[in-house]
UniProtKB/Swiss-Prot annotation:
Organism field: Cruziohyla calcarifer (Splendid leaf frog)
Protein name: Cruzioseptin-10
Annotated keywords: Amphibian defense peptide, Antimicrobial, Secreted
Single Gene Ontology BP annotation: defense response
Its job: Has antimicrobial activity.
Tissue: Expressed by the skin glands.
Length: 28
């Protein structure tokens, strides 16, 4: 359903943001 799609997009976005933050932290 539509909510499932939103949840999937939210998880993907959160995962991407978390991955990006981890990269920034690892560079320091």
């Amino acid at each position: 359903g539509f909510l499932d799609v939103l949840k999937g997009v939210g998880k993907a976005a959160l995962g991407a943001v978390t991955h990006h933050i981890n990269n920034l932290v690892n560079q320091q």
